[in-house]
Amino acid sequence: MTRDRSNLLYEDAGRFIPGGVNSPVRSGRAVGTNPIFIREAKGCYLWDEDGNRYVDFVASWGPLIVGHAHPAVVEAVRAAVEKGTSYGIPTEIEVRMARKVVEMVPSIEMVRMVNSGTEATMSAIRLARGYTGRPGIIKFNGCYHGHGDCLLVKAGSGLATFGIPGSPGVPEEVVRHTIPLSYNDLDEVESVMERDGDRIAAIILEPVAANMGLVLPRPGFLEGLRKLCDKHGALLIFDEVITGFRLARGGAQEFFGVTPDLTCLGKIIGGGLPVGAYGGRRDIMMKMAPVGNVYQAGTLSGNPLAMAAGLATLDLLCEDGVYESLEEKTNHLVDGLNEAAGAAGVPVFTSRIASLGCGFFTSEPVFDFASALASNTDAYAVFFREMLNRGVYFAPAQFEAFFLSMAHESKDLDFTIEAAGNAFVRVKELCAF
């Protein structure tokens, strides 16, 4: 499998784009390879500029739960773009999208559209501080909430991949009100809340941490956070940019039965186009301008193309049997990968939930950021390259999840499992455990 065209494009991109990519993890540096450049995608398949085909388990980092270029989504965008690309004036489709989100997500009574998950979390933090009159924010090590300054502390995703604890350019004064704690350690949170609860505006977290690989909440962790927020008058914010509409129609809050005060959304809600949203209780959301005095705005917020793609995607997810089918596919894939790793004698701890999964190259359980970081990233790099050469595209970094879509079929999963069997053999040959 040759990638001459991709390599030439990457070299050319480096002349004009820092690192040759518009988001760091895409570079492939964490797995010792150049990125592939994509020409087109359909269903669960990618084709690169050299004509190589890959079974895709990245799905644009999560948004494409219905698959690439689903006919219903394509037609919705086509119909919208023929009327115009952006107006900067309210449209009916924004109202339809807002109504749909309120119907689907248990905690959301009102919602505001933005253009990215980062905008959603930044806005939710500002709103929480404005509503409570408090400055403090608790976040969790390894949880990634976009690249807003106050949350870029001990974060996951690309910062974990490249070993960056924070970022130059973020002054200490900006993050001094941010308290990073250990995910899944309820006792630590309780201790901080007992000491500083009267200055904590909110606790924000990914209810399932999907930016340090995939780490599930321990039983009682989310429920405990809800109780602590209620006790101390803080808001609970779920960052459901990844889990929203993926774990269930109502996201992780429906899946676990825990209701936050505010919810941040992105990825799936845009159907593959740039979009984000934040919403929650009516009394909190009514603090936003123009009815309240907490300010947030955006030139392209509620963009009609993104609303059209998102609505078409959400309509597809409301069909019968979608989530049951996705979970069945995920179990089939993960069981096959585990069996292949075991046969090759490669230690892998696999985490899965709904249509999300991650294989950590370690024999120890992974339950927080520290245990995730203890996994063998060199082994993952070998696995990634071997799978890529066999026509399967996983995330080019250990600390990212893989995603299944409605477009994956049994033949694609079986193809992937067979490829993994050979890849794990190579991992065993090349890596020390």
Swiss-Prot record:
<feature type="modified residue" description="N6-(pyridoxal phosphate)lysine">
    <location>
        <position position="267"/>
    </location>
</feature>
<protein>
    <recommendedName>
        <fullName>Glutamate-1-semialdehyde 2,1-aminomutase</fullName>
        <ecNumber>5.4.3.8</ecNumber>
    </recommendedName>
</protein>
<dbReference type="GO" id="GO:0006782">
    <property type="term" value="P:protoporphyrinogen IX biosynthetic process"/>
</dbReference>
<dbReference type="InterPro" id="IPR005814">
    <property type="entry name" value="Aminotrans_3"/>
</dbReference>
<dbReference type="InterPro" id="IPR015422">
    <property type="entry name" value="PyrdxlP-dep_Trfase_small"/>
</dbReference>
<dbReference type="GO" id="GO:0005737">
    <property type="term" value="C:cytoplasm"/>
</dbReference>
<dbReference type="InterPro" id="IPR015421">
    <property type="entry name" value="PyrdxlP-dep_Trfase_major"/>
</dbReference>
<keyword id="KW-0663">Pyridoxal phosphate</keyword>
<dbReference type="GO" id="GO:0030170">
    <property type="term" value="F:pyridoxal phosphate binding"/>
</dbReference>
<dbReference type="InterPro" id="IPR004639">
    <property type="entry name" value="4pyrrol_synth_GluAld_NH2Trfase"/>
</dbReference>
<dbReference type="Pfam" id="PF00202">
    <property type="entry name" value="Aminotran_3"/>
</dbReference>
<dbReference type="GO" id="GO:0042286">
    <property type="term" value="F:glutamate-1-semialdehyde 2,1-aminomutase activity"/>
</dbReference>
<keyword id="KW-0963">Cytoplasm</keyword>
<comment type="pathway">
    <text>Porphyrin-containing compound metabolism; protoporphyrin-IX biosynthesis; 5-aminolevulinate from L-glutamyl-tRNA(Glu): step 2/2.</text>
</comment>
<keyword id="KW-0627">Porphyrin biosynthesis</keyword>
<dbReference type="InterPro" id="IPR049704">
    <property type="entry name" value="Aminotrans_3_PPA_site"/>
</dbReference>
<dbReference type="InterPro" id="IPR015424">
    <property type="entry name" value="PyrdxlP-dep_Trfase"/>
</dbReference>
<comment type="similarity">
    <text>Belongs to the class-III pyridoxal-phosphate-dependent aminotransferase family. HemL subfamily.</text>
</comment>
<dbReference type="GO" id="GO:0008483">
    <property type="term" value="F:transaminase activity"/>
</dbReference>
<comment type="subunit">
    <text>Homodimer.</text>
</comment>
<keyword id="KW-0413">Isomerase</keyword>
